[in-house]
Amino acid sequence: MCVLMEDSSMSNGIDVDKGFAIAFVVLVFVFLIVMVFRCVKLVKNPYEVSSTTADLPLN
């Protein structure tokens, strides 16, 4: 009977390692999606994206 109680408590408990792994995978996918959109924007119009860093005067 004690073994059954331990098994049920383990299934109802929060697995911290699994939570960290899922959170890490989700964050990596979000980062990759953001990078894909930024790269597509750069490929579509490279001059508009780089114009903010190249606005230095030529004096």
From Swiss-Prot:
The name this protein goes by in its record: Cortexin domain containing 2
Gene designation: Ctxnd2
Annotated InterPro entries: Cortexin (IPR020066)
Cellular component aspect of the GO annotation: membrane
Any Pfam family the entry gives: Cortexin
UniProt main location, coarse: membrane
Location(s) in or outside the cell: Membrane
Keyword check for Nucleus: no
Keywords linked to the UniProt accession: Membrane, Transmembrane, Transmembrane helix
TM region(s), chain numbering: 20-40
Disulfide bonds: none
PANTHER family with a match to the protein in the record: CORTEXIN DOMAIN CONTAINING 2 (PTHR16736:SF6), CORTEXIN-1-RELATED (PTHR16736)
Membrane topology: Single-pass membrane protein
Organism field: Mus musculus
